[in-house]
């Protein structure tokens, strides 16, 4: 879309993603003088322009970051208010948190989550508006502490279950078969040295560490920092105890 905005003529993108971020980018490009139609549908049409002009624009809240903070409350069985959020962008996520037994209350652009006991549930990643693959790993940390057995199926990316081995180091009971993980919840996780193998796996390790007994050391912060701004500071502000080490060894 960005390349097509300044290309000669008309560009048609078929099988386009339906994610809110795509719609938001189209709105920004239109505000800068481009002509984009169809964002939010499988077909997007872009009529390029010679130049774009400046504009003031507020991007939508990060739904994956919001989901991560909701999970931080759920995995620690806490109450937390997260905002600003657009609940419609988190529909599949909120449905699963509701299945888990969390209480969710919306107040304008804020969501308050309360969690006491987490029940097992199944999930399958799907393109938006389905369950986001970017929250599969963080949700698996939650399911590792749930009551009962859960099944997680990853349908979007290959090799996106590498965090399973790291959760197992913390005492999680998980069996893998292809792109499917079967998680038997345990009463407590145990702190351990772990490594985030990608952006969302790193966040999953931090969440697991919040709920674990003892100290958890997470490596792979180069991945974490690519998708979260000052994650540890935000979590510490609501009661976490996280220190960033220059050399965790």
Regions picked out by a protein language model, each given a short descriptive name:
Residues 1-249:
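Short, structured segments at the rim of ligand-binding sites
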């Amino acid at each position: 879309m960005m390349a097509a905005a300044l290309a000669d003529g008309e560009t048609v993108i078929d099988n386009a993603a339906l994610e809110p971020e795509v719609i938001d980018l189209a709105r920004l490009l239109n505000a800068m003088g481009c002509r984009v139609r169809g964002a939010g549908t499988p077909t997007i049409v872009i009529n390029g322009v010679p130049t774009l002009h400046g504009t003031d624009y507020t991007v939508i809240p990060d739904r994956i970051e919001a989901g991560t903070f909701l999970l931080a409350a759920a995995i620690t069985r806490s109450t937390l208010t997260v905002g600003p959020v657009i609940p419609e962008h988190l529909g599949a996520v909120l449905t699963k948190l509701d299945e888990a037994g969390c209480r969710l209350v919306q107040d304008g652009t804020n969501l308050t989550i309360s969690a006491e006991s987490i029940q097992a549930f199944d999930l399958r990643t799907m393109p938006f508006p389905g369950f986001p693959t970017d929250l599969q790993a963080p949700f698996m940390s939650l399911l590792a502490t749930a009551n009962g057995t859960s099944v997680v199926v990853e349908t979007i990316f290959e090799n996106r279950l590498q965090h399973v081995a790291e959760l197992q180091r913390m005492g999680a009971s998980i069996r893998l078969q292809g792109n499917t993980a079967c998680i038997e919840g345990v009463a407590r996780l145990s702190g351990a040295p772990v490594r985030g193998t990608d952006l969302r796996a790193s966040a999953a390790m931090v969440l697991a560490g919040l709920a674990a007994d003892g100290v958890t050391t997470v490596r792979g912060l180069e991945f974490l920092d690519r998708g979260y701004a000052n994650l540890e500071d935000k979590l510490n502000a609501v009661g976490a105890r996280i220190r960033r080490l220059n050399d965790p060894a």
